[in-house]
Design a protein with these regions (language model features):
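Post-cleavage N-terminal segment of exported redox proteins
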Residues: 1-9
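Structured, soluble extracytoplasmic/luminal domains of envelope-associated proteins
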Residues: 44-84
Length: 186
């Protein structure tokens, strides 16, 4: 299934990103460990979640479900929220590497300065008050907000960008990234 904007699938366990991000201060890379190293962001295993939740959350129905999956040695069948077509290869690591670090906010990225600049449209997804000419420090976990939105403030994860080819091509153009077909279609 493909979900529209401002909606997402029902999940087998209601996972509160708000609790983990806002209250506990965890960032995306704590659970999605491969996002800055590999093509995929990876969903943490039941065993990974139980590392904390074997002792935390005794009064929670959702954590009881998690513990049941663990006891039965069953993976959680999470429903995918963000999806690109099968013929598209999106490499998370390359995008994290490109967008993270100290960046000068510009209207359009200069091809010769791609490692030190970020387009205003992308910067304001991370820092809503960003302005052209400012230097911002973009953490790896903040890069996720460019395409996924502020998941840390979502009680239920939903898609906030179309993730269609035109959206990707526009972002590549704004950031002087390659736009030839084989960049994403191989």
């Amino acid at each position: 299934d493909i979900y529209g904007f401002n909606e997402g699938p029902e999940q087998p366990i209601a996972f509160p990103h708000t609790k983990h991000v806002q209250e506990l201060g965890l960032d995306c890379t704590f659970c999605h460990r491969t996002v800055a190293k590999e093509a995929s962001a990876s969903i943490p295993s039941v065993e990974f979640c139980v590392t904390c939740h074997k002792i935390i959350g005794d009064n929670s129905e959702e954590i009881a479900k998690l513990r049941s999956y663990n006891a039965n040695e069953k993976p959680i069948d999470w429903q995918r929220v963000h999806r690109v077509p099968d013929h598209v290869h999106f490499v998370h690591e390359a995008h994290i590497r490109f967008f993270s670090g100290s960046k000068n906010v510009v209207n359009t990225v200069d091809r010769n300065k791609v490692s030190s600049q970020i387009a205003l449209d992308d910067a304001i997804r991370i820092y809503p008050n960003a302005k052209v000419g400012e230097i911002i420090d973009v953490k790896e976990s903040q890069v996720c907000m460019t395409c996924h939105g502020d998941v840390g403030s979502m009680t239920k994860v939903k898609q906030i960008r179309p993730l269609k080819m035109a959206d990707c091509v526009n972002c590549h153009r704004d950031n002087s990234a390659p736009t030839d077909c084989v960049t994403c279609h191989y």
